[in-house]
Amino acid sequence: MNYFNYSRRQANEVYVGATPMGGAYPIRIQSMTNTVTMDTEACVEQAKRIIEAGGEYVRLTTQGVREAENLQHINASLRAQGYQTPLVADVHFNPKVAEVAALYAEKVRINPGNYVDAARTFKQLEYTDEEYAKEIQKIRDRFIPFLNICKENHTAIRIGVNHGSLSDRIMSRYGDTPEGMVESCMEFLRICVEQNFMNVVISIKASNTVIMVHTVRLLVEQMEKENMAFPLHLGVTEAGDGEDGRIKSALGIGALLCDGLGDTIRVSLSEAPEAEIPVARKLVDYVLKREGHPYIPATEAPEFNYTHPSRRETVAVGNIGGDQLPVVISARLNNDLEVSEQFKPDYLYCGQRLPENRRADIGYIVDACAWDGSEHIYPAFNYQQLIELHHHPAKMKFLFTSYLGLNEEVMACLRLHPEVVIVAQSNHYNRLGEFRALAHQLINQGLKNPLVFFQLYQETETEDLQIKSAADMGALIIDGLCDGILLYNHGNQISNLKVDETAFGILQAGRIRTSKTEYISCPGCGRTLYDLESTIARIKAATAHLKGLKIGIMGCIVNGPGEMADADYGYVGAGRGKISLYKKKECIEKNIPEEQAVEKLIELIKANGDYKD
C-alpha cells in the first residue's frame, strides 16, 4: 500500500454463488434482513427490497437448525422469481447450524468468538501453553468438518470477528485489544490455509471506529506476514440511525476504503435494511473516483506507525493544538452568524468582512486585510503573504496553504512563527493523500504548528455531505493528524447549522471530541424480538440532551454486552417482548416487559445521578 496514493489492495478471488468478489471484481454492497427467518414470505419480500435497492448479497440470521433448513425454501422462492443474489447465513454459537446452512446458502458467516469457545462471560482464564494448544485443537475438530461440507457444496465462508463477542480465552491471553481480535481471526485462517480452503472472506468489526480501523490495518499486516490475501468485508457495528449512523459508518469504512482496503461493505443502520444500500453505494462510488489520480510525491515520516498511530506533536496556539480537543471552524462568508448552542463552532471564518455583532465565546478569523486588532479577531494569510505574516503583530495567525504551496520559504516562515495555525487546502482528486503528504512534510521538517483541515464541498443533499466529509476526515483523525476541521459547503442548499452539526458529528464519530449523547445501536436482525426503530426514537427523545453519555441499544445478546462494554448504560433484547438493562457490563435488571423498559432505563440513569433535566 502507498500511504499517499490510492490503489486497491489485490485480494484473492472468492466465489459466492453467481456474484464473485475480491480480485478485480467490484466492491460489493450488502445488507441483512431483520425478519424472522422461519417466516419465508417475509424474508423473501425483504430480500427482494434489498436486492432491488442494489444489494448484491443478502444475509439472514440463522439461530438454529430449523432456520438453517428454511434457507432452502427462501432461496428456492427467490430463484423461482428470477433473483440470483447470493444468500448468506449468519451463524453464532452452534457449528451444527453452520454445517446445515452450508447446504442451502451461498455463504456462511461464523463468529470465531463463539463457534467453539463458550459464550463470553468476561472471566479471566489461565491456560498453560499446552492447554491453549488443546483449545486450538478443539477448533480444528469442529471447523474442519464444516470446511469439508463447504468444499462439497461450493459454499463460501466469512470468518467474522466482532469486538463485542471475543471469547474469554482470547481476552485472557491478549486482552480486549486489536491484537486479540486479529489472533481470533488468524486461528481460523491458518486452518483454512492448511486445509487448502481459500473461498474465505474475513471481517473484523467494532462499534468503536478507531478500534475497527486499527484492527483491520493490523489484520492486513499480519496476513501479509503469513502470505495471505483474503478479501475483506468492512463494517462498523451498531453505528446507529440517521446522521449519526451515516457519519460513523462513512468515517470507519471510508478510512479503510480510501487506503484501498475492502472488497465488500455493509453500512449497519438501525433502519430498514434496504435503506443501507444507497448509503453504501454513495460511499463506495465516492472513494472510487480517486482511482488513477495524479501521483502525489511524498515521504512518510519515519516515526509514524500506520497500525498504531499516535497524535502528531504540536504546540498549543490559543485553544488549538497541543493536548487540546480539536476545534471546529465554520466558514461564514455570507455574513450569516447564527450558531447552535449545542454545536457552537470555536471560530467563524468571515473572509474579508469583519462582523459587527460578535460573541465573546467565539473567535473570528478574517483575511489579514480586514483585521483591526480587536479582541477575539485573528488574521488569516495565504502562502503568498509571508512578508506580511512575518511582520504582523497578532499573537495568533492562520495560514491557508496546500501541499504544493508548502515550499521552503513557507516552512522557513513557520519555523519562525510557532503561533501560526496551518489551514490545509486541497483540490486534488485524492485530497486525503495530499493532506497526509502535507502533514508528514511538517513532521519530517520538525514543524509543530497545529493543523486544521479545510474540507470544501458543493452538495445539495445533507446525506451526501455527511458521507463524503466523514470519509475524507476518517483517516486524518485516526492517524492523529487533526487539530481541527473547517467544513464548508458551497451554495445555500445546506444550512450552516447543519454543516456545523456534521463537523461535530465527525469529531465524535472519530472519538476525539464529544458534543452530544452517543448511541450504540444495532441494525436489528431476526434475533431482535422488539420494535427496535421506535425504541431508539423513544430513548433518544428522553436522553438526547445528556451530552457525553453513551447508551447501548441492542437487539439481542450476541454482541450486546460486549459492544456495550464502552457504554454507560445498555438496553438489550432478552426474548420476545422482554428487555434487560445494563450499567456498564453489569446486568441490573432482567426480563422487563418492553412497554416498561424505556421508563425503567431512565429511572436507572437517574438513580445513578447521570440524568439532568
Locations of regions flagged by a protein language model:
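Beta-strand/loop-dominated core regions that host nucleotide or nucleotide-derived cofactor-binding catalytic loops
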Residues: 576-579, 587-610
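C-terminal accessory/binding modules appended to enzymatic or scaffolding proteins
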Residues: 322-343, 531-575
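Active-site beta->alpha loop and helix N-cap motifs at the rims of alpha/beta catalytic domains
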Residues: 55-187, 318, 327-339, 344-433
